[in-house]
A protein has these predicted regions:
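Short, acidic/small-residue loops that bind anionic groups at enzyme active sites
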Residues: 77-79, 83-88, 130-131, 139, ...
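Charged, low-complexity interaction regions
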Residues: 232-241, 254-260, 283-294
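Glycine-rich, charge-decorated loop segments at or immediately adjacent to ligand/cofactor-binding or catalytic sites
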Residues: 56-64, 165-177
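Short amphipathic alpha-helical heptad-repeat segments
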Residues: 265-280, 296
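A charged, well-structured terminal subsegment
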Residues: 179-219
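C-terminal amphipathic helix plus adjacent low-complexity
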Residues: 203-236, 242-247, 261
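Acidic/glycine-enriched connector segments
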Residues: 53-131, 135-136
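Glycine-rich beta-alpha loop segments
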Residues: 4-85
Length: 308
């Protein structure tokens, strides 16, 4: 079996990031602004963008972010490799064929059906869901089913929860899992550009150290739990993510039992604090009952007493 058949990730250079999002701007200007920044960061980190070949809305913003920032890094990261792969169908391609922005995308894959388009996009290493409409929701549902049923190589899914956009969907997915209709999907939820960049950096390091795609997925599951710890450490000490990672790996590999327990407690505390912060934010935006938040807060207080 070849490395490609195993889903092995050989190098972090030019990791492919698939972004799914809306072809409209949405009512909140932050959707387009944040997704343009995401495109810029994809280029600056030397990643490649796989997306649905659109020049408008959220998707157009991501593409412009990449195109506006990749040339200054062409020699270092890209060489002759195009920074964007547009994946579309014949009908959609003909709508945009003469578009000034899209003509800058030198690699375009034209599939026969929307189904094949989705399958092609899922060849990326990382999948990001940005604010969008029913098309984005369709791709999110399709990707979850494909991965859980074994038709898709396991890989990290990032939810870019700009201004709480995905709160309702995340709650619905939790209800499905709790009701026994679906397995929980370990989405890496990021709320802003700092969290998104931290997740990208950690995934890049994890890909560099994993043997195959299944291990990358397991790492992503763990990252969903550990991410708040990295964010908190960055805020408290202004150190680089890579240094925090190295310190964590050192403790896990050769630290004493007390050090390991202290690290585990810090990670758990940061995770619970982030969950509570996110739940209060969700309540403010959706008006949901506070019972769940109260329960989480009680658990956190109990654990803090134990840690002391």
């Amino acid at each position: 079996m070849t490395n490609e058949e195993k889903g092995c990730v050989r190098s972090t250079k030019n990791l492919r990031v698939c972004v799914s999002g809306g072809h409209c701007d949405g009512k909140d200007p932050a959707y387009v602004e944040e997704c343009y920044k995401m495109g810029a960061k994809i280029a600056k980190m030397g990643f490649r963008l796989d997306y649905g070949f659109s020049n408008s809305g959220v998707m157009g913003a991501v593409a412009r972010g990449v195109l506006d920032n990749w040339r200054e890094r062409q020699d270092k990261y890209y060489g002759d490799v195009t920074p964007i792969v547009g994946v579309t169908t014949r009908e959609y391609y003909e709508l945009y064929e003469k578009d000034e922005v899209l003509q800058q995308i030198s690699e375009v894959v034209v599939e026969d059906t929307l189904e094949n388009r989705k399958i092609k996009l899922l060849e990326a290493d990382i999948v990001v869901f940005a604010p969008g409409g029913v098309g984005t929701l369709d791709e999110l549902a399709y990707d979850c089913v494909a991965m859980q049923d074994g038709f898709l190589k396991t890989k990290p899914f990032i939810i870019y929860n700009v201004n709480g956009f995905f709160y309702h969907i995340l709650e619905y997915l939790k209800v499905l899992a709790a009701s026994g209709f679906a397995s929980p999907v370990p989405f890496i939820v990021v709320d802003d550009s700092e969290e998104r960049e931290t997740a990208f950096r950690l995934l890049r390091m994890r890909y560099n150290n994993c043997a195959d795609a299944r291990e990358a997925y397991a790492n992503a599951r763990q990252l969903a739990y550990e991410l708040p710890y990295f964010l908190k450490k960055k805020t408290d000490s202004s150190v680089h993510v890579e240094d925090i990672w190295a310190e964590m790996k050192e403790i896990e590999a050769s630290g004493g039992e007390e050090q390991k327990q202290a690290l585990a407690s810090e990670i758990e505390q940061a995770y619970l604090e982030k969950e509570i912060e996110r739940m209060y934010d969700r309540l403010a935006k959706t008006g949901r009952d506070t019972a769940i938040v109260s329960d989480k807060l009680t658990r956190l207080k109990q654990r803090k007493k134990k840690w002391k």
